[in-house]
């Protein structure tokens, strides 16, 4: 028996489909997506920004929680995976809410800022390649409104961020460790890290 939110049938089907995929472990945890959906309803999200779509689980979960006029801006570079995401959006009846940008996310974020979209988003999720995380964060901080939330996935890197790395550690480890340590001192946000999935940090913009 499940305690908490019931999983939408389309999301359940996608999760089952990805269980047998060799990269299926890249998908956001069901509990994390449920939390994002809950947050979207709590703070009445109308515009959602997602960096790293993969096969569309989190974008679908949040889009389902948005009002009919809600908008999702989705950033990715992988056509193969986002084709699955498009199928999922169609099946869930949310494709009309979602705008997919297939180019490096930093380009899309800079375009949005240049187009006057600063402080217009209510919620953002960073769930992409780890080295640019600090750059993604700074752009999202410009794009999210005061009182909005920036969520960052995989902040624990399977627990590796809690330990000193060695010469075999990926560059992303040091970058994420430094970034994580900087958040409590950042006066622009109120951070909290939850041990859900591979670690989810929520940043409330002041």
Kindly label every feature range from the protein language model.
Residues 1-125, 130-151, 155-206:
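A short alpha-helical cap/connector motif
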């Amino acid at each position: 028996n499940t305690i908490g939110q019931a999983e939408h049938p389309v999301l359940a089907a996608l999760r089952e489909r990805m269980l047998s995929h060799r990269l299926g472990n890249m998908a956001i945890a069901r509990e994390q997506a449920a939390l994002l959906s809950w947050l979207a309803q709590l703070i009445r999200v109308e515009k959602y920004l997602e960096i790293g779509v993969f096969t569309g689980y989190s974008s679908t979960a949040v889009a389902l929680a948005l009002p009919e006029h809600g908008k999702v801006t989705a950033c990715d570079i992988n056509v193969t995976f986002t084709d699955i995401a498009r199928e999922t959006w169609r099946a869930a009846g949310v494709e009309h809410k979602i705008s997919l940008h297939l180019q490096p996310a930093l380009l899309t974020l800079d375009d949005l800022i240049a187009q006057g979209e600063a402080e217009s988003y209510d919620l953002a999720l960073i769930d992409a390649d780890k080295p640019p995380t600090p750059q993604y964060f700074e752009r999202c901080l410009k794009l999210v409104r005061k009182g909005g939330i920036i969520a960052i996935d995989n902040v624990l890197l399977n627990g590796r961020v809690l330990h000193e790395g060695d010469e075999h550690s990926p560059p992303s480890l040091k970058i994420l460790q430094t970034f994580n340590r900087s958040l409590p001192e950042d006066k622009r946000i109120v951070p909290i890290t939850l041990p859900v999935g591979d670690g989810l940090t929520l940043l409330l913009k002041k």
